[in-house]
Amino acid sequence: MLKTLGRSVYLTQFEEQRASLSAFAAGGAPVFISLHISEEFDAAYCARVQEMCDFLSAQGWRILADVSEKTIRQFGCADLTALAKRLHLWGLRLDYGFSLEEMCALAQQLPVAVNASTTTPEVARQLAAGGGTVIAMHNFYPRPETGLDPEFLRESTAALQAEGLQVYGFIPGDALLRGPLYKGLPTLEAHRTAAPSAAFADLALNYGLDGIFAGDPEVSAREQEYIRHFCTTGELCLPVVLRPGYETLYDRTFTCRPDSPKGLVRYQESRLYSCFGSTVQPDNCAERRRRCVTMDNIGYGRYSGEIQLVRTDLPADEKVNVIGEVPAEYDLLLDCIKRGKTFRMVKTS
């Protein structure tokens, strides 16, 4: 189970991020920074980076920095180890310009992250055999349509994990996006318009990633709370808009029945929780589209009061009431609710 959501901090937006980074109890949570974004370079660059890293370290963040050979020269350090010490870096993300031998040697001194999309299983095997701490990290993709496909992410992640590497990736933010495109910074293209908590759960449960960062500068407090709840309890928060009269179903823990079919989530406790019992009258017996929450009415006899979440479009049924709907940005969560696992419906603000 993942313990927390990592953050990304950008020098040009650091002052905008400072307040939330101060308010959040880091406790060793990871934060990603890049030290080779050319548009950030100016005469005060090194001093500004130093101040940012001093702050992050003092707040308890573990800093993972994206670096290049040029970074060493910019800061006037003898080598990457000296740079890491100066900037309080927990780990270094290395991309182009470093040999396998250099990466293995550096990994003996501090955690090293390599590019998960370009590192072959053979190279991963050699890195893992070196005995140091090596992580494979997927990129984020600012331009729409350039994010990874599901098949590639799943296959590359599994191949690297099979060789002994942990694999990290990125999800988009929702409160403050990164320019100049402001289109989200996900690893997976399908996550670009998704809610952060839904993308987080998808990477964790359906792709098996070992670490997840928000690529954009800010994630809303609400989404952070959904992620925190999942990380600490294993229970998914499912935002739902329920029709009037059904609000008592909010904030109750439900279990996906172990025998649920692929197209439906059957709520194991629904008839136990239901205050409607056999009195559920037909109401809003509409088409049951994916993301609809339904309740069987009296037409289904003893099934009256049973709740289901629709994962595959179904026709209208006079014996089934549509009582709510999951917002589109949380669609990914429907395929994260596994048989036998718990979740709770929460009210959207």
Residue ranges and their predicted role:
Residues 1-3, 348-349:
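Short, Lys/Arg-enriched, disordered terminal segments
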Residues 2-133, 140:
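Active-site beta->alpha loop and helix N-cap motifs at the rims of alpha/beta catalytic domains
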Residues 6-9, 76-87, 105-119, 160-164, ...:
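Short secondary-structure transition/capping segments
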Residues 52-56, 75, 171-176, 266-273:
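A broad, low-specificity signal for short, low-complexity segments enriched in glycine/proline
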Residues 65-81, 99-104, 152-155, 205-214, ...:
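Electropositive, surface-exposed helix/loop patches at the edges of structured domains
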Residues 115-245:
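Catalytic alpha/beta core domains of metabolic enzymes, predominantly
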Residues 244-349:
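C-terminal functional modules
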